[in-house]
Amino acid sequence: CGDINAACKEDCDCCGYTTACDCYWSSSCKCREAAIVIYTAPKKKLTC
């Protein structure tokens, strides 16, 4: 990911929930809710 605010191309498995997330500078997906997203699964818990 080149843009820290860019949305990930795939969903991440965060805390047992599949949820959209934002990309960080690494290639790995970190759990953080995107600013604008349509959830197809329950939101992740705030704390893991």
UniProtKB/Swiss-Prot annotation:
Expressed by the venom gland. It comes from the Eukaryota. Disulfide bonds join C1-C15, C8-C21, C12-C48, C14-C31, C23-C29. It is found in: Secreted. GO terms for cellular component: extracellular region; host cell postsynaptic membrane. Keywords: Disulfide bond, Ion channel impairing toxin, Ionotropic glutamate receptor inhibitor, Knottin, Neurotoxin, Postsynaptic neurotoxin, Secreted, Toxin, Voltage-gated sodium channel impairing toxin. One of its GO terms (molecular function) is toxin activity. Negative results: has no effect when intracerebroventricularly injected into mice. Insecticidal neurotoxin that reversibly inhibits the N-methyl-D-aspartate (NMDA)-subtype of ionotropic glutamate receptor (GRIN) and inhibits inactivation of insect sodium channels (Nav). Inhibits glutamate uptake in rat brain synaptosomes. In vivo, induces immediate excitatory effects when injected intrathoracically in houseflies and cockroaches. The presence of a 'disulfide through disulfide knot' structurally defines this protein as a knottin. Belongs to the neurotoxin 03 (Tx2) family. 05 subfamily. This is Delta-ctenitoxin-Pn1b. It comes from Phoneutria nigriventer.
